[in-house]
Amino acid sequence: MTIIDSQVHAYEANTAKRPWHSVPNWPDHVTGDEMVAAMDKVGVDGAIFISAFSMYRYDASYAVEVQRAHPGRFAVVKPVDPDDPDVADVVADWKNTPGAVGIRIMLAKEAKREPNDPGLERILRAAALR
């Protein structure tokens, strides 16, 4: 039986190259290589890598980098911002990213956001296009 972890996060140490947006109460790093080693140790064949929003916000470049280094082990999900006027282009570009399997809509203003919000509509329309 193939075992897939449905949600993992990996991240580098906080550096000038890839600075964190916030400093959570987590280990200093859990790199892609460390994640693969941990998966191998417990018999996990693959995982859905969700880019760590709390650290990298909407930049999924580390998730893409890890997926490229470990093809076949990770599928990747990128957070998207409904308040970004270019979010439809972001989604369209993401759909062409090798290993991309989804987006994560980050609702920073959920209490005030209406279901017919234009940003949500842009995301859903872009995601539905083939």
Predicted segments, located by residue:
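An N-terminally biased module of ancient metal coordination in phosphate/nucleic-acid-related enzymes
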Residues: 1-58
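Active-site gating/metal-coordination segments in enzymes
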Residues: 54-130
